[in-house]
Amino acid sequence: MSQSFAPQQAPGLIGKAGALQLDQKSLAFRASAVMLGTLFLAAASRIEVPMVPVPVTMQTFAVAMIGALYGARLGTLTILAWLGEAMIGLPVLAGGAGGLAHFAGPTGGYLASFPVMALLVGALRERGWNAQRPLLAFASMLAANALCLAMGGLWLAGLIGTEKAIMLGVAPFVIGGVLKSALGAASLVALSRLAKCGDAE
């Protein structure tokens, strides 16, 4: 009696939860993903609305997306690699800036929050807060943005006082955080649908 076996299809890069399936990839592939992630973060930093003392950028969107796409461990590593590039002077921060001075200035608290944001979004993704549950995906990104504003605001308060920190470093970014969280969740849903279409072919 003969048996026929259909060839197993290799898993795609994008999973049905809208995340990248990097765990089973080679070390070289994951290292390349980290490099691409830092480029994505640098590009997002260039999308800027100048404000004083903290500019509006797409950094938090990119950070949350890296956490959601890469997962907690690799996502956090990617953010740390990007911040390392900034520390040695590469022009990867808002407005093409770089250097250690930015970690001690008004934006220091926000920069410090980015690895924690990626860790939070990635950890929640691994617990089902992903594209298959869009509202939870949105909530995870919103929580990460709130964490960023809290850490950034606390740092800024130490430099310019609590009232000014809230007025200049927190309040102007609340609506943007909500919108970027919605955009992030929608992007994950779109990637999830793309993966399903690929599986159907």
Feature map (PLM): residue ranges:
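Generic alpha-helical transmembrane segments of integral inner-membrane proteins
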Residues: 35, 39, 43, 65, ...
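Hydrophobic alpha-helical transmembrane segments
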Residues: 31-35, 61-65, 75-81, 107-112, ...
